[in-house]
């Protein structure tokens, strides 16, 4: 069961010219994630890390991913806004009647944790671009560049 009231995901304005995907982390705290979708991109995605703890494991992972993606690839993408659900504990929905609330979002991160390794983060984007990223798909490029310890 959730320890507090179930927060309602909402879009938040972002002054960054690269809108970011905002998400709610059940039982933890709101967080901000950036995702790529097709389109022209006029500048660096680094502004999307505003407000994110630069020392966090998630922040470090995003920086490694962007270093591992060829610059040409990044220049052909734009960031877009959306709402997703991060499930820190997959057993939370069982018996909680939150299944329908969770299923309405195009992106759901299961077994997400604020502790431990974010290197296994799997991103499933089914809205707008149908772009699918997995840690496996990027691992070769990241390892080639020596970005993963």
Swiss-Prot record:
It comes from the Eukaryota. InterPro entries: Beta-gal_alpha2-3_sialyltrans, GT29-like_sf. GO terms for molecular function: beta-galactoside (CMP) alpha-2,3-sialyltransferase activity. One of its GO terms (biological process) is ganglioside biosynthetic process via lactosylceramide. Gene3D superfamilies: Glycosyl transferase family 29 (3.90.1480.20). One of its GO terms (cellular component) is membrane. PANTHER family: ALPHA-2,3-SIALYLTRANSFERASE ST3GAL I ISOFORM X1 (PTHR46032), RIKEN CDNA 6430550D23 GENE (PTHR46032:SF7). This is Uncharacterized protein C20orf173. It comes from Homo sapiens (Human).
């Amino acid at each position: 069961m959730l320890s507090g009231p179930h927060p309602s995901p909402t879009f938040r304005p972002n002054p960054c010219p690269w809108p970011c995907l905002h998400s709610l982390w059940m039982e933890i705290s709101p967080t901000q994630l950036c995702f790529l979708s097709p389109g022209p991109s006029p500048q660096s995605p680094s502004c999307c890390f505003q407000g994110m703890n630069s020392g966090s494991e998630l922040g470090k992972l995003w920086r490694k991913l962007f270093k591992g993606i060829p610059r040409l690839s990044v220049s052909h993408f734009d960031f877009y806004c959306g709402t997703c659900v991060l499930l820190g504990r997959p057993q939370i929905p069982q018996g909680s009647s939150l299944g329908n609330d969770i299923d309405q979002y195009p992106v759901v991160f299961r077994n997400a944790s604020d502790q431990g390794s974010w290197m296994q983060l799997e991103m499933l984007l089914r809205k707008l671009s149908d772009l699918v990223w997995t840690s496996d798909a990027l691992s070769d490029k990241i390892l080639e560049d020596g970005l993963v310890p």
